[in-house]
């Protein structure tokens, strides 16, 4: 077949017109060094702080140090096969995690990937792990309670929805037990829970998950795990990932509770990363921004106004406030609350529950020290009945501690002092509570009423715990309607007072403890 020049030129024009080229521009760099999970990259001129960098093998690193001629990034996951000369690319994205109701009942890692063997996670989208906390105008004052189920906490150190309450104490003083019981107590409250395990043994986390499942609380809980075997980067980011999952509920007019267990290990992981990135060390070798590490996390726990929720949901949710309540845990060394990280977190939070090893070893559990434990905003959130009945408890314990120390030196004590010491011992005994046995508002109110109105005076100290158990069993059997009314309303008036008095009078008459 012979083509003339005109046909050839027409064919070339046609092909040129149909030619389509798609070009993709990537900001590409080269790894110049790899050590201890930190990579140095040359050539990423347009990288953002905190941006995800795509590595070979479908992995990512996060850019943390932006220097004049190189970028310091921390690898998310294994790094043994990374080598000098490998090419990496910018993604233009900040780290995001999946959020939504589909995560409830699941155990996930820092990146939101399932690690419980139950298949893929259903989610409603992705949310950046780093979010700016709601502003002052978007917030609302704390005035609704979060019941932990512990008498000593709900009576003396009440927690409100949207509050940040620190749980602080030495190792093996019951910090995790208190937090896990608080989650178990939310089964029927409608509060969604997030438990973030940072730097813990896998066996410990497995036990927590099993206990939550046994008590029917796992279906209402998201467990985020960055265990001790995970990289420092994942341990550092885990609290922010958990917080993003909690904010999903807060911003849609619901209530959520998040436990950070514990932030001491997160600070250690961040210190490790900072030192490997050659940032200048400060006090206790922590970097200069370790306060900001925790403040930007804990400020995201808040109670937001109905207007904020309405604007966020584009009018889908109206007239509802949302809240995210945080219970960060800090581990102290030999009770030293004046160390760097504990003082930082104490100053950020709205109060602290201080657990003492001396009390724990003496069998007083939860080992709460009421003298230095405080809730700065929770008092406004207490139910009326708890506020009315708990007033004398803290005073009685404070006087008891003072007199107990004094009585060791005094040989003969007057009757009034003996009476106060006796009452203090019985209140201390009454506030003891076993793990995984949270109490309802009505049950707590009944116990506190017995202590307040002198019903324990003729009960031997060794019989206080059996007395309380028998009283609660009697009340739930004979006066279930009264307990239900108190749980639903939380009010306290002369009628309720008379009914409580009647319950205790009738019970004391049975002598059945």
UniProtKB/Swiss-Prot annotation:
Record flagged with keyword Translocase: yes
PANTHER family (UniProt xref): ATP SYNTHASE SUBUNIT ALPHA, MITOCHONDRIAL
Membrane-related topology note: Peripheral membrane protein
Binding-site residues, ATP: 169-176
Assembly and interaction partners: F-type ATPases have 2 components, CF(1) - the catalytic core - and CF(0) - the membrane proton channel. CF(1) has five subunits: alpha(3), beta(3), gamma(1), delta(1), epsilon(1). CF(0) has three main subunits: a(1), b(2) and c(9-12). The alpha and beta chains form an alternating ring which encloses part of the gamma chain. CF(1) is attached to CF(0) by a central stalk formed by the gamma and epsilon chains, while a peripheral stalk is formed by the delta and b chains.
Keywords of the record: ATP synthesis, ATP-binding, Cell inner membrane, Cell membrane, CF(1), Hydrogen ion transport, Ion transport, Membrane, Nucleotide-binding, Translocase, Transport
Enzyme Commission (EC) number: 7.1.2.2
SUPFAM superfamilies, sorted: C-terminal domain of alpha and beta subunits of F1 ATP synthase, N-terminal domain of alpha and beta subunits of F1 ATP synthase, P-loop containing nucleoside triphosphate hydrolases
Enzyme type, top EC level: translocase
Disulphide bond pairs: none
Similarity remark: Belongs to the ATPase alpha/beta chains family.
First-listed, main subcellular location of the protein, grouped into a coarse class: membrane
Keyword Transcription set for record: no
Catalysis: reaction(s): ATP + H2O + 4 H(+)(in) = ADP + phosphate + 5 H(+)(out)
Record GO cellular component, one term: plasma membrane
Name of protein: ATP synthase subunit alpha
Gene behind this protein: atpA
Functional description taken from the UniProt entry: Produces ATP from ADP in the presence of a proton gradient across the membrane. The alpha chain is a regulatory subunit.
PROSITE patterns assigned to the protein according to its UniProt record, in alphabetical order: ATPASE_ALPHA_BETA
GO molecular function, one term: ADP binding
HAMAP family with a match to the protein in the record: ATP_synth_alpha_bact (MF_01346)
């Amino acid at each position: 077949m012979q083509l003339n020049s005109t046909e050839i030129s027409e064919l070339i024009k046609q092909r040129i017109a149909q030619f389509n080229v798609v070009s993709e521009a990537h900001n590409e760099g080269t790894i110049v060094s790899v050590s201890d999970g930190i990579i140095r990259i040359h050539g990423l001129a347009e990288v953002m702080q905190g941006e995800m960098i795509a590595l070979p093998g479908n992995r990512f690193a996060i850019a943390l140090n932006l220097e004049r001629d190189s970028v310091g990034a921390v690898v998310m996951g294994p790094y043994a096969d990374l080598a000098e000369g490998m090419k990496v690319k910018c993604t233009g994205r900040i780290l995001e995690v999946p959020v939504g109701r589909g995560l409830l009942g699941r155990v996930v890692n820092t990146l939101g990937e399932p690690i419980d063997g139950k298949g893929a996670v259903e989610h409603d989208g992705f949310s950046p792990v780093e979010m700016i906390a709601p502003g002052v105008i978007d917030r609302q004052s704390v005035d609704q309670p979060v019941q932990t189920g512990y008498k000593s906490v709900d009576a003396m150190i009440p927690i409100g929805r949207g509050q940040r309450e620190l749980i602080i104490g030495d190792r093996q003083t019951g910090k995790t037990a208190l937090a896990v019981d608080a989650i178990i107590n939310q089964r029927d409250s409608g509060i969604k829970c997030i438990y973030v395990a940072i730097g813990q043994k896998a066996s410990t986390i497995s036990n927590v998950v099993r206990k939550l499942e046994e008590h029917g609380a796992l279906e209402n809980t998201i467990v985020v795990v960055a265990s001790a075997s995970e990289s420092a980067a994942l341990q550092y980011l885990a609290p922010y990932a958990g917080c993003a999952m909690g904010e999903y509920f807060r911003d849609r007019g619901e209530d959520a509770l998040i436990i950070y267990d514990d932030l001491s290990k997160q600070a250690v992981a961040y210190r490790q990363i900072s030192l490997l990135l050659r940032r200048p060390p400060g006090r206790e070798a922590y970097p200069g921004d370790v306060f900001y590490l925790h403040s930007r996390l804990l400020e995201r726990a808040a109670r937001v106004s109905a207007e904020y929720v309405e604007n966020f949901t584009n009018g889908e949710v109206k007239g509802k406030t949302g809240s995210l309540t945080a219970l960060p845990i800090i581990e102290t060394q030999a009770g030293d609350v004046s160390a760097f990280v504990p003082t930082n977190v104490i100053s950020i939070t709205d109060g602290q529950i201080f657990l003492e090893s001396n009390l724990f070893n003496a069998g007083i559990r939860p080992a709460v020290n009421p003298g230095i434990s405080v809730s700065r905003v929770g008092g406004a959130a207490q139910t009326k009945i708890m506020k009315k009945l708990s007033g004398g408890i803290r005073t009685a314990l404070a006087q008891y501690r003072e007199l107990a120390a004094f009585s060791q030196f005094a040989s003969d004590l007057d009757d009034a002092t003996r009476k106060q010491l006796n009452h203090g011992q019985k209140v201390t005994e009454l506030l003891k509570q076993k793990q995984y046995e949270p109490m309802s508002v009505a049950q707590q109110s009944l116990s506190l009423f017995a202590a307040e109105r002198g019903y324990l005076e003729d009960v031997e100290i060794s019989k206080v715990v059996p007395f309380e158990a028998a009283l609660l069993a009697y009340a739930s059997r004979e006066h279930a309607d009264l307990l239900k009314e108190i749980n639903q309303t939380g009010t306290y008036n002369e009628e309720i007072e008379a009914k409580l008095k009647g319950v205790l009078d009738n019970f004391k008459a049975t002598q059945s403890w």
